[in-house]
Amino acid sequence: MNNATIIAIDGPAGAGKSTVSRLLAKELGYTYLDSGAMYRALAWALQREGVDLEAEAHVARALPELPLEFSTRGGSLLIHCGGKALEDELRNPEMAAYASRISQMRAVRTFLTEWQRKLAEAGKVVAEGRDTATVVFPHAGVKVFLTADPAARAGRRHAEYLAKGIRVDYAVLERQIRERDEADSTRCLAPLRPADGAVILDTSDLDISEVMSRLMDLIREKSRG
């Protein structure tokens, strides 16, 4: 795997990782690898099979038998479970909560880390998540840690849900984000932190065009060596 073909973007929930990664992949002609969608898909598949998400041993036993497939085409990540394409069902607060729960399980992280690395072998990728640069692709050619204050992140997530027709209370979202930050940064397994050599970018007061401009400058600088 050529390290120069991987751009790894980490950061807390709502920092803009998904939006920025999707735009970067399109701009560069890379594949967008959405690890959050992969965790939500796994949670959805486990629920579909009636697996108790609180029982790590049950989850670990179920993983090899799940009819879950990840692939890439035309720069996009495709997710199927039992022949069904998973898209909108993964984008709701409930599934995000389930994904957060199983993401703390070692067997789950190992399972999806292997999938992410396998997908990256097929070509150039922009990969995003919470341990993408620290664990999944520690030797990525470009490593970025996107962050923003919790209020700004809650506002962005609230707007995303409203755009999808999902009504969610802003205060609840902000509380969930703060709780998720605490859980992610203090967990024993792959805690949320900037990777060695990562560029830290606070997006609290930046719009998407400003973030993209800074990241493209960084990528050009890295490509020049």
Swiss-Prot record:
Listed EC numbers: 2.7.4.25
Sample GO molecular function, one term: dCMP kinase activity
Catalytic activity: CMP + ATP = CDP + ADP; dCMP + ATP = dCDP + ADP
Domain of life: Bacteria
Keyword ATP-binding among record annotations: yes
Membrane-crossing residue ranges in chain numbering: none
InterPro entries in the cross-refs: Cytidylate_kin, Cytidylate_kinase_dom, P-loop_NTPase
Biological-process GO terms, alphabetical: pyrimidine nucleotide metabolic process
Any one GO cellular component localisation term in the record: cytoplasm
Broad EC category: transferase
Family membership noted in the UniProt record: Belongs to the cytidylate kinase family. Type 1 subfamily.
NCBIfam families: cmk
Name by which UniProt lists this protein: Cytidylate kinase
Organism per entry: Syntrophobacter fumaroxidans (strain DSM 10017 / MPOB)
